[in-house]
Amino acid sequence: TSQNSDDLMDGSVDAVVIATPVRTHYKLAKRALLAEKHVMVEKPITMNSTQASELLSIAKEKNLKLMVGHTFEYNPAVEAVHKIIQSGELGDIYYINSTRVNLGLLQADINVMWDLAPHDLSILCFLLEENPEKVSAIGSNFVNRQSKYEEVVYMTLKFKSGILANLRVSWLDPVKQRSTTIVGSK
């Protein structure tokens, strides 16, 4: 660890981990990549896809690793579900419903989608071994109506295989809930 990011840019450091407020991810990751460092960034990787694409381009150009902290993909339960899906035990997957809600910790610099949904999105893509081709989302802020950041978001994803996924994330639910339901033909 270091209080000064300059300490991390010298030649004795091969890689950096960025676990700072989201608004700083892009600047710090770009600086590290340009200094020829492999980078792991806590989720979400950046504030928007344009910034993420730029970081990915720099990493590819410099042959560096750029990783995001999607740690749930390595959870034994998620790995077990992946094996069950791949084995065909559930048959053809029709749809997936995912919920990640809790009360509190409203973020000041990102919306609930960027805070909570990256976990579920990475899990979905890992389980299905594909990325969505269509995404729609709607959200709102109820507590802090002056904020530009949603506190509740509903997303629908459609995959090329025809699988649908619904995702609900919220900072306002009175009971913490983490659930994923996978519906298949068996």
Q: Where on the chain are the PLM-derived regions?
A:
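C-terminal glycine/acidic-rich active-site capping loop/insertion
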Residues: 71, 181-186
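Beta-loop-alpha module in the N-terminal Rossmann-like domain of NAD(P)-dependent dehydrogenases
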Residues: 1-58
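Conserved SAM/SAH-binding loop
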Residues: 3-6, 100, 140
